[in-house]
Amino acid sequence: MRLIFSLLLLVGCTVQAAEPVQSFTDDLGRVVNVPLHPQRIVSLHDLDITIPLIELGVPPVASHGRTRPDGSHFLRSGVLLTGVDFDNSNMTYIGTADIDIEAIVAAKPDLIITEPSRNTPIEQLEKIAPTGQHRSS
């Protein structure tokens, strides 16, 4: 949660041409340089990252989610806690267990927030956008 709040402090209302960056240490002790005002956040965990971002007024442009038996996608507890889900927002579904790297690239993120249980190597995510890891408590 500390990472999410730290990143939210960096989120601003405007984007400048040459976006300044700020360094912080993520929950795994890595120093990460992130945009001072990220506008296009991708979340790699629905309940631990996406829901808190939505609750704080910073919905991600794309998120990990779950799949129903009928094949439709949803945010775990999303409707219950926030009223937000993939079918009533502009948020893009990027996968469940296996994350769709092409969908992340297509979302054009300026910040990716992941957590240690994701199968996607952080080195691969860092080639797309600055990536911070959040360890859920």
Task: Please give the residue ranges for each predicted region.
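Bacterial Sec-exported substrate-binding components of ABC uptake systems
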Residues: 3-5, 13-51
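Short, intrinsically disordered, charge-balanced linker/junction segments flanking boundaries
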Residues: 11-17, 134-137
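Extracytoplasmic/secreted envelope proteins and their assembly/folding machinery
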Residues: 35-38, 50-54, 101, 105, ...
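Conserved acidic residues
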Residues: 39, 92, 110
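Short His-Asn-centered micro-motif
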Residues: 44-45, 114-116
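A short, structured surface patch at a secondary-structure boundary
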Residues: 47-101
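Charged, glycine-enriched surface loops/patches
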Residues: 64, 121-137
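Proline-aspartate-enriched helix->loop->beta-strand connector
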Residues: 101, 105-114, 130
